[in-house]
């Protein structure tokens, strides 16, 4: 049985993009980012529990907590054209004493991952990390998460990439968290740092979005019918006030006060935060999958320092206005398109600080092109 064979085919647009050959907008995507895509939640453990002819796969406790959210009804065969991806970033310390955010841009790690050449043409990785209690957890995650991912990435022929990428991501997050907690607990006094993590792993034209905490990933997609760009949420925030998160925390013996774990921690999933792991805080990410289409313009990854003062729609429209600003021209030998994306990141980060965001601000924009 195909991993997603039980899912209905996506609806097709009556007016496909000329020469694209790729999948179009799937009908279960929200019209705009609502900030809570809970209605789209679908656990991969439910989808793969029957494998082969009636064989059952047992889901581990961690997999039950880490659900894969489908941003489309079925992963279609990718277009013969692989969309190019290129990341740009800007960061501001804001009013904080220390810059505790971290980020990683790896436009092409295909050679490092050594994927099955017959199945995968390109692998890319983009991530933002929002540290709290210090910079050590976010810095550690930025330095090690992708390295662990590369080591665990599916290799060799005769494997199903679709079936193994989620396990690869789950193992990567678990291993990275365990490594940091081991190092943190060996210190005197023990480190209490923690970090969110929002990662986009692109395997050809398929995005896998793994998220812990309240940093976010947003996709800008053009709607041909409305002739407008939509901001589509690719990640799910993890706050202790959410029902499932609160129930897990309480079941583990913790509690939620004033919207925080034990009245202190603002997020319910993170890397690090060793003192809260026994209280139900977990490093198991939510994993979503999204097929890129010819109508996709860019991906925005940002920490909550941006979204405290910008809605996703406002941020996407702000970036679009920068990309259409003809005053931004080629400079320092860089093409105009690069100059505009860099300006969009810098202007958006500056505007967030001007609007009063007291937090660190990290803005990453990933350009999607042919």
Swiss-Prot record:
Residues 33-45 have a biased composition (Low complexity). Residues 86-368 form the PPM-type phosphatase domain. It comes from Bos taurus (Bovine). The modification N6-acetyllysine is found at residue 188. Residues 46-69 have a biased composition (Basic and acidic residues). Its EC number is 3.1.3.16. Belongs to the PP2C family. SMART domains: PP2C_SIG (SM00331), PP2Cc (SM00332). The gene is ILKAP. It is found in: Cytoplasm. InterPro entries: PP2C (IPR015655), PP2C_BS (IPR000222), PPM-type-like_dom_sf (IPR036457), PPM-type_phosphatase-like_dom (IPR001932). The lineage of its organism: Eukaryota, Metazoa, Chordata, Craniata, Vertebrata. Mn(2+) 2 binds at residues 130, 304, 359. It is an enzyme of class 3 (hydrolase). Mn(2+) 1 binds at residues 130-131. It catalyses: O-phospho-L-seryl-[protein] + H2O = L-seryl-[protein] + phosphate; O-phospho-L-threonyl-[protein] + H2O = L-threonyl-[protein] + phosphate. This is Integrin-linked kinase-associated serine/threonine phosphatase 2C. The modification N-acetylmethionine is found at residue 1. One of its GO terms (cellular component) is cytoplasm.
């Amino acid at each position: 049985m195909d991993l997603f064979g039980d899912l209905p085919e996506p609806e097709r647009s009556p007016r496909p993009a000329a020469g694209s050959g790729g999948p179009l907008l799937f009908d279960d995507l929200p019209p705009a980012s609502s900030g809570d895509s809970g209605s789209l939640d679908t656990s991969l453990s439910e989808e793969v529990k029957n494998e082969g002819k009636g064989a059952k796969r047992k889901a581990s406790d961690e997999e039950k907590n880490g659900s894969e959210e489908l941003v489309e009804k079925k992963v279609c065969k990718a277009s013969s054209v692989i969309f190019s991806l290129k990341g740009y970033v800007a960061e501001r310390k804001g009013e904080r004493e220390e810059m505790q955010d971290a980020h990683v841009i790896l436009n092409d790690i295909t050679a490092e991952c050594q994927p099955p050449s017959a199945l995968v043409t390109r692998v890319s990785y983009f991530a933002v990390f929002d540290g709290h209690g210090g910079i050590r957890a976010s810095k550690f995650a930025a330095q090690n998460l992708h390295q662990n991912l590369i080591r665990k990435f599916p290799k060799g022929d005769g494997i199903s990439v679709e079936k193994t990428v989620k396990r690869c991501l789950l193992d990567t997050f678990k291993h990275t968290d365990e490594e940091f907690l081991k190092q943190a607990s060996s210190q005197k006094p023990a480190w209490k740092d923690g970090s969110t993590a929002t990662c986009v792993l692109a395997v050809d034209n398929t995005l896998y979005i793994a998220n812990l905490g309240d940093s976010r990933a947003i996709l800008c997609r053009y709607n041909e019918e409305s002739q407008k760009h939509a901001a589509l949420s690719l990640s799910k925030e993890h706050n202790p006030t959410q029902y499932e998160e609160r129930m897990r925390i309480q079941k583990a013996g913790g509690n939620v006060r004033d919207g925080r774990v034990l009245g202190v921690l603002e997020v319910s999933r993170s890397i690090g935060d060793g003192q809260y792991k026994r209280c139900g805080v977990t490093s198991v990410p939510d994993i979503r999958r999204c097929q890129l289409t010819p109508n996709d313009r860019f991906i925005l990854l940002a920490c909550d320092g941006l979204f405290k003062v910008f809605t996703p729609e406002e941020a996407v429209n702000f970036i679009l206005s920068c990309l259409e600003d003809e005053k931004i021209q080629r400079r320092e030998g860089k093409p105009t398109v690069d100059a505009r994306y860099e300006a969009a990141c810098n202007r958006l980060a500056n505007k967030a600080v001007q609007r009063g965001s007291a937090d660190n601000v990290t803005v990453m924009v990933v350009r999607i092109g042919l």
